[in-house]
């Protein structure tokens, strides 16, 4: 059964389909075993169109209790490109440190309960490939949706946003758009925290004139009441094209999921 993965990867695969081959290569290098299949699929919710990123675990490893130190060792021992590996280690480290803080344990004792080895590795590797592909870009982010309610976890019911998300996204701007449920996942929050620490991700409005080059839209699985469940990424280049400035300068994305 194909499972819909995160909107971050989906949006960038809509923007740049060629990234799929690099994501598959990186996932193969990690050696998750079994019959793991990755797929990008066009999707329309009847209002907007974009892409979904799908994963079929097949007979792959599937554990919902994965120690951080096991994931770290697996990444260190892998043959994936160094920059992609460092991105993945950085994202998982952000997540592990947040989990350690909220549960009052040592970071070396962190076990990821809510994400299986395959799920989390694919999401983080996909994000790591994307960050490497756009390593020269400046990153900007709109206000984040807050969400409300509770989520059932291995630790029982927890309030939303989940405690790890709150820890990861301290200092970020949020808004309440009236939608309930989880709006930013811990993995998504870890990607944003890592982008802030490693790429200077900002939520401040851009004041320099830029030329809009392209966009991508990634859809999640949940249906929201009042809006499309998507993340949109906009790519900007310099206002006036010149040979020495012929590259992407700015990536801005909005989370409406």
Q: Predicted segment positions?
A:
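Short, small-residue-biased leader/transition segments that mark boundaries at the very start
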Residues: 2-4
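Alpha-helical support elements that line or immediately flank enzyme active sites
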Residues: 7-19, 126-134
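Conserved short loop/turn motifs at secondary-structure junctions
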Residues: 12-13, 41-42, 111-118
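Glycine-rich nucleotide/cofactor/substrate-binding loop typically near the N-terminus or early
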Residues: 14-103, 162-165, 170-174, 179-189, ...
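Divalent metal-coordination and catalytic microenvironments
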Residues: 53, 119, 192
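Long, contiguous binding/interaction regions
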Residues: 109-116, 188, 249
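Active-site pocket-lining segments that scaffold enzyme catalytic pockets across diverse folds
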Residues: 123
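Mobile "lid/hinge" segments at catalytic clefts and subdomain interfaces of large enzymes
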Residues: 136-255
């Amino acid at each position: 059964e194909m499972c819909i993965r995160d909107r971050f990867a989906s949006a960038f695969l809509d923007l740049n389909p060629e990234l799929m081959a690099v994501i598959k290569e990186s996932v193969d290098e990690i050696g998750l075993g079994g019959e793991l299949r990755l797929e990008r699929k066009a999707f329309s919710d009847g209002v907007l169109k974009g892409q979904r990123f799908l994963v079929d675990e097949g007979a792959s490893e599937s554990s919902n209790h994965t120690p951080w130190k096991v994931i770290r060792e697996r990444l260190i021992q892998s043959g994936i490109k160094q920059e992609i590996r460092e991105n993945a280690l950085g994202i998982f480290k952000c997540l592990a440190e947040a989990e350690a803080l909220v549960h009052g344990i040592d970071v070396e004792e962190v076990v990821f309960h809510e994400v299986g080895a395959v799920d989390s590795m694919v999401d983080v590797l996909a994000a790591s490939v994307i960050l490497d592909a756009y390593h020269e870009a400046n990153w900007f982010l709109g206000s984040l949706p807050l969400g409300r309610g509770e989520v059932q976890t291995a630790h029982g019911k927890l309030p939303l946003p989940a405690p790890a998300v709150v820890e990861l996204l301290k200092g970020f701007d949020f808004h309440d758009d009236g939608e309930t449920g989880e709006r930013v996942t811990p993995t998504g929050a870890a990607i944003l925290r890592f982008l802030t620490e490693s790429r200077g991700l900002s939520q401040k409005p851009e004041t320099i004139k830029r030329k809009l080059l392209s966009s991508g839209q990634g859809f999640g699985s949940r249906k929201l009441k009042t809006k499309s469940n998507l993340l949109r990424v906009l790519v900007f280049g310099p206002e006036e094209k010149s040979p020495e400035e012929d590259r992407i300068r700015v990536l801005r994305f909005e989370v409406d999921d």
